[in-house]
A protein has these predicted regions:
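Structured, solvent-exposed acidic/aromatic patches
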Residues: 1-284, 288, 324-326
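C-terminal functional modules
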Residues: 257, 264-268, 282-411
């Protein structure tokens, strides 16, 4: 059963911590350890943090089954866990070829993943509203905005050390029908979305159908609103094959802090404060993107490096906690932002577990002809090579191996 699998994983991690904590244990040779260069203390922190993540995933399911995981969670919260960016469990890319490079790089292949994937309007609006410094690191401004300027105008804009050529297209040359599009609001309702002239930051409106494909980046025509270059895209940093900020992430310290904040808010642990864990999670997320804590400039336009005041950001409306139940929504939102382009699987799992950020579920539900996916289906060879266990597992899921089947931790 899935309960037994979770218990087995808990046991594996406990045993790993026991072995690594033994002073007579030599651990891995530093030149054989690609994660922590033979540092046993970091492996212990990673194991404890992984266990804490798994316990957060399954807390409610175990509680319903008669087992309270709170004492085990408290033991970790009072002990050793990932708490600094140097504790992050992630791998660097060599950048020597396509297979050993960051997944959105443009040096090899078509570069379509980089050019055609776009942030949603909700995400960009949210980041603009709180002037989130991560936006200036991960994304670039609209390269060909529809403009109120009377003639086509070029402007070079430097952000975070990268220079972008922005070409303003006069609105006089645009079909008026292309200045509005039907989209969906955060409740899934169909609304009219106007294009904001001269926008530097304009995310992709949520479409009416999941099949809608946005135009390519070569401005070949069609609905100008939906042209790729009319919308915010990934920054030049994200196109690189390798960089200290572009890593294969297993788990980061910022996630652990948000897990601790959630656990403290829910009463699963009694150590620390929700506020301290939450704000430390934000600061660690900023730090991993090399956002400098300092005096924030009036604008990040023209910057060689993004600088922001960490404490001032945490005090902003929409970010600061207020001690109410809404704090769980803010924790989930900041955790979701910290997962941007680095840990999509955990972001997906977290939403399935908590239902937060809530707007995702509302928009997904508005596509009523589709069943929301909760899980990956089993590999095809399981049904033939492991038929007995496969059949038993599918039976526990309700008889069908479907993405929409809820797992034990979600029931």
């Amino acid at each position: 059963s899935q309960k037994e699998i979770y218990e087995y994983m808990f046991g594996l991690l406990d045993n790993a911590v026991k072995i690594l904590s033994d002073p007579n244990s030599q651990g891995l040779p530093s030149n054989h350890d690609v994660l922590f260069a033979g540092d046993k203390t970091k492996w212990v922190k990673f194991a404890n943090s992984l266990k804490f993540r798994l316990m957060a995933h399954s807390y409610n399911a175990f509680k319903a089954a008669g087992k309270d995981l709170a004492p085990e969670m408290q033991k970790i919260a009072s002990g050793s866990y990932m708490s600094a960016t140097t504790d992050n469990a992630s791998l660097a890319f060599s950048g020597l070829n396509e297979g050993e490079s960051w997944y959105l790089q443009t040096k090899w292949g078509t570069g379509n993943d980089y050019s055609e994937q776009k942030p949603t309007k909700y995400l960009i609006d949210q980041m603009v509203a709180i002037d989130d410094p991560r936006m200036y690191v991960i994304f670039k401004p609209v390269l060909t905005p529809i403009s109120s300027k009377p003639v086509k105008t070029n402007e070079d804009i430097k952000i975070n050390g990268f220079t972008y050529r922005v070409t303003y297209d006069p609105v006089s040359g645009i079909n008026p029908n292309d200045l509005n599009v039907a989209g969906r609001d955060l409740n899934g309702n169909i609304i009219n979305v106007p294009y904001i002239l001269d926008s530097k930051w304009f995310g992709t409106p949520t479409p009416l159908t999941v099949q809608l494909i946005y135009a390519g980046s070569n401005l070949t025509g069609g609905n100008s609103f939906y042209d790729n270059r009319r919308l915010t895209g990934f920054s030049a940093l994200i196109a690189k094959p390798t960089d200290a900020r572009l890593r294969a992430v297993m788990m980061e310290s910022s996630e652990m802090m948000f897990l601790l904040a959630e656990a403290r808010k829910n009463g699963w642990i009694s150590t620390g404060t929700v506020k301290d864990y939450y704000e430390q999670g934000i600061k660690l997320s900023f730090s991993r993107w090399q956002i400098v804590d300092g005096t924030k400039p009036a604008s990040h336009i023209g910057s060689d490096q993004i600088i922001d005041n960490y404490n001032a950001y945490c005090a902003k409306d929409g970010v600061a906690l207020d001690g109410t139940a809404a704090d769980l929504d803010k924790i989930a939102l900041q955790k979701w932002l910290s997962f941007l382009i680095t840990n999509q699987t955990e972001a997906f799992t977290d939403f399935n577990r908590t239902g937060k950020p809530a707007f995702i579920g509302k928009i997904a539900a508005s596509f009523s002809s589709y069943s929301y996916p909760y899980r990956y289906t089993y590999p095809l060879d399981e049904s033939s090579n492991n038929k007995e266990n496969y059949t038993s597992a599918v039976t526990a899921l309700g008889g069908k191996d479907l993405p929409s089947a809820k797992m034990w931790i979600q029931k």
